[in-house]
């Protein structure tokens, strides 16, 4: 079985860079990132590995909703200037890059999904909870900084909903970290209660006459935001990827 280690590049590198005493020390960063990747390769023993990077193009999510990820700190200049050098260094050490046009998330989701379609296994190295919507048993999520798997069961317990309801939950409650609006006035607690009764976002709106009047009013007024939030949260898993597995094989 092909076992593909897919590293969310900026999710890993920005955390490592932020912990450095000197943010301009790109040589030190290269060594630290490579050390982290060696540790990942040694632990997971994949047949293939790649690090996926965000691109500079405006994402379709940002084009759809201007406030998406608004307020996030920009990438430090020293890190931005050192990325090309970092990627080349990692390639020299048997870890090739995939450069997304905009957000890496959809490329990672597509690659992981394609792996499962050929009976492969994908291990996504990222702390981004959005990947928990990829619930195929052959897709796993690894938190490098806490050295443990981010399991579907843990996320279900944390949010209070089933894995099949993750997107519906965020469409209702929103996601402050990514500035996903959700339905104004419907917080996490209300979202959980509604999904326990009606099971899905579609069922909630199809049964709006069975919802209490106050909540029904909020839901009706926030219907467009719910639809928008659902789109923003949902990962694309069918992007065209011009890559060949052979490019990313790890020589044992």
Curated annotation (Swiss-Prot):
What Pfam family does this protein match (any one)? 5_3_exonuc
The protein's superkingdom reads Bacteria
Q: Which UniProt keywords apply?
A: DNA-binding, Endonuclease, Hydrolase, Magnesium, Metal-binding, Nuclease, Potassium
- The segment(s) forming the 5'-3' exonuclease domain are 161-251
Which SMART domains is this protein grouped with? 53EXOc, HhH2
Amino acids binding K(+): 172-173, 181, 183, 186
Q: Which cofactor does it need?
A: Mg(2+); K(+)
What GO biological process, any one, is recorded here?
DNA replication, Okazaki fragment processing
| Protein EC | 3.1.-.-
Q: Where Mg(2+) is bound, by residue? A: 105
Q: How is the cofactor bound?
A: Binds 2 Mg(2+) per subunit. Only one magnesium ion has a direct interaction with the protein, the other interactions are indirect.
Q: Name one GO molecular function term.
A: 5'-3' exonuclease activity
Give the span(s) annotated as Interaction with DNA: 185-190
Provide the top EC class: hydrolase
Determine if Nuclease is one of this entry's keywords. Answer: yes
Give the record's family classification: Belongs to the Xni family.
The record's annotation in PANTHER family points to: 5'-3' EXONUCLEASE FAMILY PROTEIN (PTHR42646:SF2), FLAP ENDONUCLEASE XNI (PTHR42646)
The record's function comment reads:
Has flap endonuclease activity. During DNA replication, flap endonucleases cleave the 5'-overhanging flap structure that is generated by displacement synthesis when DNA polymerase encounters the 5'-end of a downstream Okazaki fragment.
Q: What is the protein name given in its UniProt record?
A: Flap endonuclease Xni
Biological source species: Shewanella halifaxensis (strain HAW-EB4)
